[in-house]
């Protein structure tokens, strides 16, 4: 065990560690609060903005990141028809890319047959205020398309801030 002097010295270090943790947690909480303040106006305000450009997700890029391309686009709406190399349409524009659709595509064609998928993205949404349902995609909390009025900005801010707070513990 500790002697009296060693015990006294260790109590100082323990108290210092606890106060440092409290301060780091406060800083992480402050960051979360600022993120929420900035993004609170971003809401789901329309069903469709009419965007046809979307974001390109490639097989090569997904493999380099260590992710499956189909898993990356699950829960998103297609910005263009999904075609195989022969030109056969596997899924139509504005169709929700679901797990069932991914399974159907994988059963019907070789995975290497599809090199890229164009999806709708919040980054390309054409609305002047807010985000549309088709650019946002699935609400992962409820496993269904997002509803009008959902506070997408606050969800995003909390999704960034919460792990930061956890890392300080």
Predicted feature residues:
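Intrinsically disordered, low-complexity regulatory segments
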Residues: 1-169
């Amino acid at each position: 065990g500790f002697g009296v002097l060693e015990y006294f010295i260790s109590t100082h270090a323990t108290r210092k560690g606890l106060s440092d943790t409290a301060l780091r947690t406060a800083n992480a909480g402050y960051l979360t609060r600022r993120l929420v303040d900035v993004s609170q106006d971003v809401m789901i305000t329309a069903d469709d903005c009419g965007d046809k450009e979307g974001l390109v997700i490639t097989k090569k890029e997904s493999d380099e990141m260590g992710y499956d391309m189909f898993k990356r686009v699950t829960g998103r709406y297609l910005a263009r028809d999904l075609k195989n190399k022969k030109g056969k349409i596997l899924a139509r524009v504005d169709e929700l890319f679901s797990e069932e659709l991914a399974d159907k595509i994988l059963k019907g064609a070789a995975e290497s047959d599809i090199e890229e998928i164009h999806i709708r993205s919040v980054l390309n949404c054409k609305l002047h205020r807010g985000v549309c349902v088709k650019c946002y995609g699935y609400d992962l909390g409820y496993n269904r398309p997002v509803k009008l009025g959902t506070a997408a900005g606050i969800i995003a801010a909390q999704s960034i801030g919460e792990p930061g707070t956890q890392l300080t513990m």
